[in-house]
Amino acid sequence: MTGIGEQSIAEQVRRLLEPVLERDGYELVEVEWARLAGRWTLRVFIDKAGGVGIDDCQAVSKTVEPILDVADVIEPAYDLEVSSPGLDRPLRKPGDFDRYAGQRVHVKAYGPVAGTAPGAPARKHWTGVLKGFRDGAVELDVDGVLHRVPHDQIAKANLEYDVEGDLRRKD
């Protein structure tokens, strides 16, 4: 779990690295600052058109290490990990929700949200097919019902990899 200090460090790192990575053709998807197995770890998740490989992760690591050292925003010793966002890629920006329209997603709100669909009870979780981002809300089809979740109410949204569907397509 990320505390206030951890959020602050992650946000400082994001502001510092985002323009540099964009210049180099990468999208900074997410920054995580957490204590794992007794050590501080800074995780930087990147993406680019066509996907991210190990060479990209190594290149970004070599680019950001000196920037982080000079900026000195992180006091304790830490491990730096650079990777792709993975199959369960987080969705944050409005453009993310349009780019991944048609994909299966899981959306979690900060608290129960009422009125996301006509007659729907207040709820905190939705899993369905992403339709896109319209008028400040994320639209998704949950079992044939269109739900609109206000973007400012979303705590977390991720792509949800459909293993069974992928296996069926390969047969």
Curated annotation (Swiss-Prot):
GO terms for biological process: ribosomal small subunit assembly; translation. Disulfide bonds: none annotated. Gene3D superfamilies: Ribosome maturation factor RimP, C-terminal domain, RimP-like superfamily, N-terminal. InterPro entries: Ribosome_maturation_RimP (IPR003728), RimP_C (IPR028998), RimP_C_sf (IPR036847), RimP_N (IPR028989), RimP_N_sf (IPR035956). It holds the Pfam family DUF150_C. Keywords: Cytoplasm, Ribosome biogenesis. The keyword ATP-binding does not apply. The keyword Metal-binding does not apply. It is found in: Cytoplasm. GO terms for cellular component: cytosol. Required for maturation of 30S ribosomal subunits. HAMAP family: RimP. Belongs to the RimP family. This is Ribosome maturation factor RimP.
